[in-house]
Amino acid sequence: MSTVSTSAADQVRAAFDFTVDKFPLSGPDGMRTPWYAMFRSDNNEVVGEGSVTSRYVPHQTEDVIALVDACESVFDEASQVKTHFRNGHYVTVSPSDEYRRSIYGSNDNIFPRLIIRGGYDRSAFNVTLGIYRDACMNLAMLRSVTETYQSIRHTSGLRFAMDELVAQFETLKNGWNTLESLVHNMQAADVSMVDFLNEVYPEPDADAGQRAVTIHRNRTEKIFRRLQRERIKTGRPAIDSSFTVSAWEAYNAVQGFHQWDAPRREGFKGEFDRILQAAKAQPVRKAEDLALAAAA
């Protein structure tokens, strides 16, 4: 991951200073096939998870920059840009602090984050409006909120579709108001943390082995410790014997565990990998459903 203090376009261009090129695949003795693979120009690493046909046109860094430019045309100049490459381009764009929203007191605030994904898996670009919570440094994406996700129709030549891109980012900007309202509703809704966790992570079966029981207990303890730390940091009162907390806190405790504390295999322990893995984790999605249901 890289972060540099130049213009957003220059940051992206410097981070992705290579092309992704398509080359034909051959069979034994040079036999021709209809299949192609993609390779990075700087290190010759294979990109993507399968072969493509001759019709496939891989996107390039300038396409990613076009999306960043469209983002800035709607959200104004980015205060920070971070980049990551794993079988595709990932960029997070941080709009200015004027979009900050206070959720509880002065120490629990949320900020919008635009997550741009341009993979080489034959799917379109997509952009997700995420929530960055400063109290725990979680970057969460509420998948069930439709205004926070846009699929980009084009896979290359995005510079020629700027009007369309800007319109899609306008939709995401409107989605920030929706997210703010939902988060305030989650903060106002009380849940039992014990019941919440039992819904997300059911108790192991009676015949489960000791290892399953230990994993379940250790996970629960880590989530409760995270919850307690965040309550102290945000100035909330101590939890009483009913273990009642806001749905917002309960969701963040689960999401934060999967982003920061859950075991990750070697090579997938970086900040961006953890964000992406947490977003795909089934317990995080279950926690989102429960928190939004409580806030409805």
Model-inferred region functions:
Residues M1-S26, T83-R86, E98-A296:
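Intrinsically disordered, low-complexity regions enriched in serine/threonine
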Residues M38, V93-S94, I116:
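Generic structural hydrophobic/aromatic packing signal, biased to beta-strands
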Residues M1-A66:
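Feature for intrinsically disordered/low-complexity regulatory segments and propeptides
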Residues E72-E98:
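A short acidic/basic microdomain associated with nuclease active sites
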Residues D63-F75:
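Hydrophobic, Leu/Ile/Phe/Ala-enriched alpha-helical segments that form helix-helix packing faces
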